Amino acid sequence: MFNVVIVRYGEIGTKSRQTRRWFENILMNNIREALVSEGIDFKKVEAKHGRVLVRTNRAREATEVLTRVFGIVSLSPAMEVDAELEKINKTALKLFRKKKRELNLEKPKFRVTARRITKEFPLKSPEIQAKVGEYILENEESEVNLHEYDIEVGVELMEGKAYIFVDKIRAWGGLPIGTQGKVVALLSGGIDSPVAAFLMMKRGVEVIPVHIYMGEKTLEKVRKIWNQLKKYHYGGKAELIVVKPQNREEMLKKIKELGKEKYTCVLCKFMMVKHADRIAKEFGAKGIVMGDSLGQVASQTLENMYIVSQASDLPIYRPLIGLDKEEIVDIAKKIGTFELSTLPEDEIPFIPKHPVIRGSWEEFRKIYMAIFGEEPRKRDC
């Protein structure tokens, strides 16, 4: 029934004409990539008057996939017809009846919303709304209600065509991936780090996922998490990078001998950031993403995050810093990573009973020198 998907974007529309065209082109490329990767045939993807039109006979399936493409605010599977009142009326009635059956309503309340994006059509928007609404009332048991409606019939007109729809499906918004550069995201296998990576993707950033190896069970879990996140990563090309640290056992043995086991978590995170820093520079990434939420665990106090941040001179982004655990879990459930994050994983045998809560850089520096025989790096800014 539907032959086109109307794609609406948000922030892109606030850009200058030249910048907007660049964003639109990246968005359209990401749309094409998403459809091809999901095996959905389409005839054309084009930008017109602040909209992107996806011409496909599988509009419902395409809409479901495209809700996961960042930069899109909402979508509508629609029927494109010539901008003639009779054709508009008949198509609107057809879609109204279909929606009425789906909702299983005998006398639905409805309204018609029309917009002339270009002005060739002789009737003004309120007149179109009145004509289409009148036609539906004459031919179908229904009631007009502009505020408390069951069905909204949308009509958009541009360049001699009318696009009629009855659904407006919300997407994630944000910016198209590929418009804001690259970052390395540390993925531990927990609930938080996938959400942090997701939120950076949402802002148009290509993510390079890095996992610091803890065991096969955890690695398998992280692979599943990344495969789920890739469903939102259209426009990004990176695959999971696994780092197997050398001499970790020796490092942990030495910190125990020093009687400074309370710094174990801070030291391990410091070393993780060092690995991420190396990979980020290798790939030309402009920062490192971590799933820290302020005060959630001992290693995520301001003092301890300050120490960990010294391991790289790149910016360290913590998009969850102001979120409660419940808010993070809610996002994880929506994006499909929560259940995966709660799968069994390898036990971590070296977590101290009493981890340091407010670590000191000077004390950490002495521990680091005693273990590695050199000064830890300290960021320049």
From Swiss-Prot:
The residues covered by the THUMP domain are 60-168
InterPro entries given in the database record:
Rossmann-like_a/b/a_fold, ThiI_AANH, ThiI_fer, ThiI_N, THUMP_dom, THUMP_ThiI, tRNA_STrfase, tRNA_sulfurtransferase_ThiI
Query: Single GO cellular component annotation?
Result: cytosol
Q: Can you say where in the cell this protein is located?
A: Cytoplasm
Q: Which chemical reaction does it catalyze?
A: [ThiI sulfur-carrier protein]-S-sulfanyl-L-cysteine + a uridine in tRNA + 2 reduced [2Fe-2S]-[ferredoxin] + ATP + H(+) = [ThiI sulfur-carrier protein]-L-cysteine + a 4-thiouridine in tRNA + 2 oxidized [2Fe-2S]-[ferredoxin] + AMP + diphosphate; [ThiS sulfur-carrier protein]-C-terminal Gly-Gly-AMP + S-sulfanyl-L-cysteinyl-[cysteine desulfurase] + AH2 = [ThiS sulfur-carrier protein]-C-terminal-Gly-aminoethanethioate + L-cysteinyl-[cysteine desulfurase] + A + AMP + 2 H(+)
UniProt keywords, alphabetically: ATP-binding, Cytoplasm, Nucleotide-binding, RNA-binding, Thiamine biosynthesis, Transferase, tRNA-binding
Principal location class: cytoplasm
Might you give the EC number(s) for this enzyme? 2.8.1.4
Concerning NCBIfam families, the annotation shows: PRK08349.1, tRNA uracil 4-sulfurtransferase ThiI
What name does this protein carry? Probable tRNA sulfurtransferase
